[in-house]
From Swiss-Prot:
EC number of this enzyme: 3.4.23.36
Keyword 4Fe-4S belongs to the record: no
Transmembrane segment boundaries: 6-26, 68-88, 95-115, 132-152
Gene name tied to this protein: lspA
Taxonomic lineage: Bacteria, Fusobacteriati, Fusobacteriota, Fusobacteriia, Fusobacteriales
Full protein name: Lipoprotein signal peptidase
Species this chain originates from: Fusobacterium nucleatum subsp. nucleatum (strain ATCC 25586 / DSM 15643 / BCRC 10681 / CIP 101130 / JCM 8532 / KCTC 2640 / LMG 13131 / VPI 4355)
Membrane topology: Multi-pass membrane protein
GO BP of this protein: proteolysis
Keyword Lipid metabolism: no
Amino acid sequence: MSKMCSSVEIGDSMIYIFLFLILLIIDQYSKFIVDSTLSVGETVPVIDGFFNLTYVQNRGVAFGLFQGKIDIVSILAVIAIGLILFYFCKNFKKISFLERIAYTMIFSGAIGNMIDRLFRAYVVDMLDFRGIWSFIFNFADVWINIGVVLIIVEHIFFNRKKRVK
């Protein structure tokens, strides 16, 4: 990684390394707690009728797509992680602070789910907002989605001036 990110100073990247680790720890710890305390399919109401913790073993990708295709999903995930890391390192000095945060979140979420695929052969999902959403997901998914939204916001609202010039 040091050769690939050789143009990035360690001091410049410490905030992103710290954010990456904090997000990864939150994701992995929440999965560990759910995996060790709940049975598959078990639901614990947190906010009645709105938010539950429900233990699901997802053997596909987001929204339950590609169930049982763990090999293909894992290969695609490794490629995506590599591309994200390459882009982040190559463009670190060119992209904005908001984009750096966004890519760090996406990278952390992708690594969090990849850890599950490698060590469990499934991804632990538990965040269940039945009142408004039919899918059950995890914190890694949250980080990825927030990161994508931040990139979209950056490009729509903050890069307009660059495009107009």
